[in-house]
């Protein structure tokens, strides 16, 4: 496969086959492309728009080469991850939701990275909370078995992620790697809550998950109260577009905050802080269940709605509203905050 030929095809707006995309990702992972070539490729793909076949091929290659976390066959794990790069840049909702869901009994294998375009990614917030994020596959599996949660730092498990990280930072805009991160769980999670930065990705990404063998999933994009695309999370300030995947069938629905059992909140309260320390304060307030101000209540409610979806996907509750109620009870009992403290202590001693 010649790089020049592939680039000419992409710039002529010809879509790649799944196999071509697979082989192209192998070239990246094998170090056959320089930084300038990678930057040109990512830019051209972003301008053309990536297809389901292309994303599937890229993800399949990354999954094949990933350092695997060997999960016991009897354990059903759930992954909670967003693409990042959303317009609003909300605080670390999916990470808070993962902790709450794990405290409620869901086995959560969270796969993530540092922030690329924002101030604080999932890896950044967990590290700030005291978690050792650089665990290998055996230690991650031990964390999952002992605590019910593990964090897998993407660059340690994916050569491609580490290879393109400097290029992505320099480019500064969303690329296919924003989409690929949540699709390439080293734990091969068959259940997933995946937030996307653009509502037009909801259906295609659900198709990719199906192609990759995921059994049950929700792909979500949240809007603000004026129907503007806003966040790669379930929204509590406006509608959420959801792609439900179950039994190889995909259904697209629009849900409102009451469908998740929460009140309509205020968008301005969900915005990420400008520093890691500021985000950490928000994050810990949520896990502690603080809701004594409008801002704290809004941040807690969105975490509960997203945690509730994880509980629902894990089939611990029959409805999304029931999942949110279970998440609320978990936080009110103090279990979420205790798990966060245990997670930090456990991983530092591995």
From Swiss-Prot:
Protein name, entry field: Anthranilate phosphoribosyltransferase
Enzyme class, UniProt record, top EC level: transferase
UniProt xrefs under NCBIfam families: trpD
Organism, scientific name: Methanothermobacter marburgensis (strain ATCC BAA-927 / DSM 2133 / JCM 14651 / NBRC 100331 / OCM 82 / Marburg) (Methanobacterium thermoautotrophicum)
GO CC field: cytosol
Upper taxonomic lineage: Archaea, Methanobacteriati, Methanobacteriota, Methanomada group, Methanobacteria
Chain residues that bind Mg(2+) 1: 94, 233
Binding site for anthranilate 1: 82, 113
Annotated anthranilate 2 binding sites: 168
Keywords: Amino-acid biosynthesis, Aromatic amino acid biosynthesis, Glycosyltransferase, Magnesium, Metal-binding, Transferase, Tryptophan biosynthesis
Residues the entry annotates as binding Mg(2+) 2: 232-233
Keyword set includes Glycosyltransferase: yes
Cofactor: Mg(2+)
Sites where the protein binds 5-phospho-alpha-D-ribose 1-diphosphate: 82, 85-86, 90, 92-95, 110-118, 122
Cofactor binding comment, as recorded: Binds 2 magnesium ions per monomer.
